[in-house]
């Protein structure tokens, strides 16, 4: 096989079990993630390919969703590599805690390690760089509409790219000085961090610090663990919670660059391009 930026060349006699006609397997941390990424594909098509608005029924995206978080995602990805049967696109959160963070979370590390070890011809990976996780890709207007009313909406006047949109800003993340300084400087409220500073001086290690702060409320609250499900109109989740609204996710098809921050624009374009390239298919006309 030969892989370049745009074309994958496959030698049939070497990979006789490979099925290029079947749908791409899209591997994410949760099944709801790939449902959200469909909208990024439509955004990319409207903004960069056709450069016009169209109905979501004009064409289709077809894929088989897979999920795995932490170490599990590496095992699932390796399984896809070993089978050599399908195309597989894997998209992972960076889990970066601040803008200067050069590290990745466990899930992203597993994806990177597996891809570097096997360099598969049938798989492509993408790890977000400009935001912490998928919830940071949700446009502000949807967080304001569906997020927990107790969440810290003031973050939208700042940079929410690395804010934990689900839980909020917790003391547990502020042990490391660079993360603490990042949020202290951004929020501009030294009084907010007095407890953190006092407890950190009393603790010798992060393990001790984590024990002391266990159970404490976030300094700034997030918008709920169900935020993404509410935004995309996850039928199973919403039915269980009796919050199902049939047209809940229709507005996601109408996102424009003006609805997004610069960081979101870059990620929506990158992920949208991959979803468009790897999952776009002909619309059934029967």
Locate the predicted segments by residue.
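RecA-like P-loop NTPase motor core
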Residues: 1-98
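Charged/polar, solvent-exposed surface patches and flexible loops
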Residues: 39, 75, 79, 113, ...
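Generic recognition of cysteine residues
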Residues: 62, 88, 123, 170, ...
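Glycine-centered flexibility motif
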Residues: 68-71, 103, 224
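Acidic, serine/threonine- and glycine-rich low-complexity intrinsically disordered segments
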Residues: 73, 78-92, 97-130, 142
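Activity-critical C-terminal alpha-helical subdomain
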Residues: 107-227
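Charge-biased C-terminal accessory regions appended to nucleic-acid-, cytoskeletal NTPase
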Residues: 205-286
